[in-house]
Amino acid sequence: MSFQQTNNNATNNINSLEELAAQELIAAQFEGNLDGFFCTFYVQSKPQLLDLESECYCMDDFDCGCDRIKREEELRKLIFLTSDVYGYNFEEWKGLVWKFVQNYCPEHRYGSTFGNGLLIVSPRFFMDHLDWFQQWKLVSSNDECRAFLRKRTQLLMSGDVESNPGPVQSRPVYACDNDPRAIRLEKALQRRDEKISTLIKKLRQEIKNNRIYTQGFFDDLKGAKGEVGQLNGNLTRICDFLENSLPTLTAQIQTTVLTTTDKYVNLKEDLLKVAILLVLVRLLMVWKKYRAALIVIILFVMHFYGFDKQILDIVLDLKDKILQTTTQAGTETLEEVVYHPWFDTCGKLIFAVLAFFAIKKIPGKQDWDNYISRLDRIPKAIEGSKKIVDYCSEYFNLSVDEVKKVVLGKELKGTQGLYDEIHVWAKEIRHYLDLDERNKITLDTETAAKVEDLYKRGLKYSEEKIPDRDIARFITTMLFPAKSLYEQVLLSPVKGGGPKMRPITVWLTGESGIGKTQMIYPLCIDILREMGIVKPDAYKHQAYARQVETEYWDGYNGQKIVIYDDAFQLKDDKTKPNPEIFEVIRTCNTFPQHLHMAALQDKNMYSQAEVLLYTTNQFQVQLESITFPDAFYNRMKTHAYRVQIKQEKSIWVRNARGEEYNALDVTKLNKDEAIDLSVYEFQKMRFDDESATKWIDDGEPISYDEFARTICKAWKEEKEKTFHQLQWLEAYASRTVAQGGSETSEYYDVWDETYFSNLLSQGFMAGKSLIEMEAEFASDAETFNAYIEYKKNIPKETKWSKWMTILDEQISALSTKIRELKNKAYKFISEHPYLTALGFIGVMISAFAMYSFFERTLTDDTITSEVGSSGDNKTQKISKRVVEVGGSGDVKTTKPAKTAVEVGSSGDSKTMKNKITKVEVGSSGDSKTQKQRNTKVEVGKELEKEAETQGCSDPAAHALVLDVLQKNTYCLYYERMVKGEMKRYRLATATFLRGWVCMMPYHFIETLYARKVAPSTNIYFSQPNCDDVIVVPVSHFIAPNAERVELTTACTRIHYKDETPRDCVLVNLHRRMCHPHRDILKHFVKKSDQGNLRGVFQGTLATFHQSANELCRAYQWLQAIRPLDQEITIYHEDTDMFDYESESYTQRDCYEYNAPTQTGNCGSIVGLYNKRMERKLIGMHIPGNVSECHGYACPLTQEAIMDGLNRLEKLDPVNNITVQCCFEPPSDIKDTMSGETPEGKFCAIGKSNIKVGQAVKTTLLKSCIYGMLSKPITKPAHLTRTRLPNGEIVDPLMKGLKKCGVDTAVLDAEIVESAALDVKQVVLTQYNSMLDVNKYRRFLTYEEATQGTGDDDFMKGIARQTSPGYRYFQMPRKLPGKQDWMGSGEQYDFTSQRAQELRRDVEELIDNCAKGIIKDVVFVDTLKDERRPIEKVDAGKTRVFSAGPQHFVVAFRKYFLPFAAYLMNNRIDNEIAVGTNVYSTDWERIAKRLKKHGNKVIAGDFGNFDGSLVAQFFGQSCGKSFYPWFKTFNDVNTEDGKRNLMICIGLWTHIVHSVHSYGDNVYMWTHSQPSGNPFTVIINCLYNSMIMRIVWILLARKLAPEMQSMKKFRENVSMISYGDDNCLNISDRVVEWFNQITISEQMKEIKHEYTDEGKTGDMVKFPSLSEIHFLKKRFVFSHQLQRTVAPLQKDVIYEMLNWTRNTIDPNEILMMNINTAFREIVYHGKSEYQKLRSGIEDLAMKGILPQQPQILTFKAYLWDATMLADEVYDF
């Protein structure tokens, strides 16, 4: 019979729980389970026993009101379960006991600590049986006694023998039990035991008979007697040991030896099994051809050794553990396991083992070396390892979370996090226990709501399963004061006080019996549906029937409708007034109505009724008790109706008074309707004091449906009215200012709360009495008055103060508890660092497994992949181009013709390394960077506190704020003159949403208008280390000369759905040509996301901080961001004394948050830190409440912003089409890395993967006749960082780029537009009558843009010998320049693979421009290898050239080359000299143009022309010159027309806001244009024409106002320009105020440098034509040619002979230069020709020249110039 069956049968024979426990204790001892059961009955320490001795549990004497019978039944089940399942450990059993106590006795004083070794039975019972327990422990050590008692106990517990006959012999005895040898062995052992027992018995008898006695003189020594007696006792104990303990000890030793031997044998077998499996697994990894066979063998071995069964048993056991949810003990154990610190470590180790099988081999030393080597290249091993560890850990943590969900069945919070949360909750309770805070409960609804939430949070914490008993007890302690505060909230008037909605009063009269009461409920349902209460049974509990005869409003619980059926039936009398009359006065009012309730718990109830329904039989109400009857009728007359039956549905009847009236004819009702509402009609009644009946009909009767709609509409209007009134009152009580600063003063009180306390304490210690000290205070009246106030304010001891004291102690204890837990965790980890190391190793192996997996997946199976390069042909990888981070020296991975970048400097130009370069902490001086010794870092003082790292709650939001927003956010300033001094004021913040569209609060515009800021005042956009990068005048925002704030067409406000404007304005700055920005619109939330924005969130405010004159970024942390669905009124700053249109404005629906915002934060973007939200940006900060530290944000969604962009585009479809454009960084740019920029106004974009190199050696060489004909005046410019003669070290590239970032002027838009319109008329006029204009009004094909049209000299093919530009020059090439993509022969290549790739790049660029995406065009900044004047070279001045990529060149030519060709075919007459052949009659035409208005001319040159270009001009050039041309063959109202316009705008933007690269830095220019674009000279000419007209207008305004029109300019000035060179012919009428000197001075005012053509600085007002130079040529009339010719300066002619270039044959270039020199010198006359000829012939005769030059006669050269016969004349 099993022991479980014995227990089941013994259940009915046990009389008490104590007996059951005793029997169970015996059974547990017999089964050897004392550790599992007996210890649960035994008290941990004797002091606990004494404390519990006087107590009783509910199971014995103490009665707590629980179900005793059910409790005892559960306890029996519990004990049976424990005795049967001996595998339960103490913790599991304790959990069961805990669940029992929680279910049946949760209020017991020891309930919270039950299970920690306390008793399950009463302490009194345990004390009574303590001796028995001790004896039992001695008895149980004897085997015979144990066997005897086992049988006896089983018989006692078995009950009736007949009902339980015992076990049945169901099978025979095994043969081994009948072995005679076993019987003999057993008898021998028995005889041995008997012999030992007999010997011990005899020994005892001998000791007893022959006791040792003292003799002789020892008899008198008591000490000796004691020692002898002790010796006798020791002999007795030795016998006891031999008889009792020694056999047991011997048996235990034998058992231990046998067990150890068995375990050793089992271990050997297990090791052998594992070794066999490992060998098979290794073979499986090596022998790929025999994998199938090996798998079969492995499966057979596993089955042979029984591994398959063990695995299945483990899985089933795990499944049972997971699915076991019937007992709390199992759940709590799993929870503890999941949160055990070893869980993560074990999981990572398992993960590592799985990775081992995935790798299919044990990583060796070479594998790890190669693995680390590869990680080192991308970019370094440490960075790569960190990223992989982060990724693997993240996925592992996600897996752990899923395991927790599956195993535990719920999402569990971290215990540590929950403890911190409880700590904060307790502190909040302690905060509101203070008297000042507690008083706010009755005054502040927000405080009341917070206190109410504290109690609810406490209830939630009490339901949590918290293993720590101290924390659970702490929660229980804190719940009582939280409940007391909650009860105070319930009794607070703030829950119902304040203004209420004036109820809609409906007064229905009619004869009795027509069904007024029956009709009331359908009316209630219709009203409730209008209120939004649509539940079918809502009318039952939302309509309250009021009986006035009952004094109390019992049963009222905030119902919205109150019905007074048969009202005013009681007569009103002065002595006994009708309470209904006065209740009408109180109820129908906005003043709060405090209801009279009978129950105490219902006190403090206020009326919330919104509709009052009165039914009466007549309108005449007798009013005697009130002094002003009109007060009654004013409340009742608004909706007074007489209910009557329609004629066709009525029948005439007579009432008791003999009057006839229409009653309802029930026979005419609709049988299908339970209540037929169609029979009623409602006659509106109007109160008329002059009428006899006081009431007259008002209009025609209406049906029920119309009546119900009228009442619902009236309710809705009154509801909205009340809502607005309450909003106004709230706003009036707490005015929110538009984030203005305020001045505060600090006051100090001499007698603070500690002053008298300190004096009294000191006095008592000195022996003074209270009377004596009070007399001293009374000597001064002011001091005595303060003392009286101090006595009044002495806090009295209350229950709140007691709770405050207790809570302070509890909170302190909890803080200590949390610190101890942290210290224990830290200590555990620090003492066991190998756990962390094992976890890290697991992650590393996992990372290596992932790497191996992808390597196997992505490589060809037919070729064995190697981790590192071994040089073996069989294992060599497929040849492919490898990109290195640094040079490795490997032939296979070395980049062609590129200097690699090393971690350290090796001095090797090829950067070939034999070993991996190591990065040192300190410098060792070794070129190989090998460390000679470890560098030690000393710490002077040990840190006293431990620094803890804190992770970011939302890395995506953090990256968004730091990387994206910071490049789109600007701080705004403006300047104005104050008392003769220009002062700078901070306005606030603006954010660019995309491209040129920025967003800012609308009240900025109002502020500028109210402060009367002049339209010409500039608004400066600044960022840290980039001041005033964008400058925009106020006139761009506010229309000038407007009587109120009126936005320009470049601005629009964002609206709500109902067209209500928000405090947010969008501004398009494309007309001001500021640089474009990235598109961040996708980061704003959508409308669909707003449903998830419930509750409270955390976030940040991206703003700026001004420290002295330095601007830095600031990120304001926002607490408790929550939606606020109500209007707020925002007031302008009180300190701002300017005149606003109104003192405040309203913002509907906003986000509210707790943050100490300040002036200047307005306009900052609010971002959420929430991983569950894909999009993070929710709004823009607009106002703040400084006193309450609250801020508010205007909500923004993608839909709302897109609606605003569409509105903006419709305002000006041409100029605002750019609102859809945006900038995106190039594809190979790391925009998250901060790149460097040259000094000046540039915008950093990031770092490039491609590092651009620079030429370091010039190709210019001194010719063989250098300095022999003339003294050299030029030399090659510097191409590298150079030390100048004055000792200064100069980087010529940085010095040249600095000129492009200078500050530029902001000009009046009207002036710029006037100049642009005049230039448009000039350049678009067709002067060449032989020209077919339709030939140019088109776009080119791809082929035409590449190879040219073939029919126009100004639309030739692209020069293919020049650089292909960014990204292309890094590609392997066989031919120089662009020839790999465009071909090298006469025909251009369009079919090769490279040609097709280029075509795809061009098409992709065009598609991006069509979508408004500015992307993937980078100009490379390089130094120009040329000769410059010696003084400029010595000053370190080298010109910078910016080369464009070839795909952009093709695309730009496709859309703009025809327009450029048209301008060049109409050259000179359109003021543009581009395309001029200086040897032809073109020079004569230029001369005639410069003599049109007389002989006074000027020739000028701009200093730093490219750097001073104003971006504002570029927009006008494109808009006023190219756009009209574009419209002649494109309809912008069609889709194709809009697409083409967007393409042209995109390509133009790539020029005027070009992206540049030097080194690996990528940045954007804010103005100017790159010199390497196809339109450079044309753009400069247009700019030149515009700037001279602007100077004319500015000078005329000051000196000749009547001459400032463009008509006067054309009448008095004619000009010609080529790039930045120009010449002007000026009439005598204006030359005194418009000349070389005045123009130069005016140019300085608009930040341009304009000097004479030679840049000498010696300027005259108006030189003659023969004195000036244009394009380094003069204007000379040739009598031989009879026209004006262009002789080149003589020093330039002779200088070209001093130099040649480093080509295959430099002398060939010299001979070409000699030929060109003779053709140029002839224009200077025959004498100069003879001088040069004699010098050249002399050098030839001396053999200095490499060959004899071919020299023509003077007349022959003139003839060639006349006929343009030589190729030198062919332009």
Swiss-Prot record:
Chain positions covered by the region annotation Interaction with and inhibition of host AGO2: 106-114
Site positions (Involved in the inhibition of host stress granules formation): R146
Active-site positions on this chain: H1003 (for picornain 3c-like protease activity), D1063 (for picornain 3c-like protease activity), C1162 (for picornain 3c-like protease activity)
Gene3D superfamilies named in the record: 1.20.960.20, 3.30.70.270, Trypsin-like serine proteases (2.40.10.10)
PROSITE patterns listed in its UniProt record: PCV_3C_PRO, RDRP_SSRNA_POS, SF3_HELICASE_2
Annotated region described as Disordered, given as residue ranges: 919-942
Domain characteristics, as noted in the entry: The BC-box mediates viral E3 ligase assembly in order to degrade host AGO2.
GO biological process, one term: positive regulation of proteasomal ubiquitin-dependent protein catabolic process
Annotated source species: Cricket paralysis virus (isolate Teleogryllus commodus/Australia/CrPVVIC/1968) (CrPV)
Enzyme Commission number(s) of this protein: 3.4.22.-, 2.7.7.48
Spans annotated as BC-box: 16-25
Annotated protein name in UniProt: Replicase polyprotein
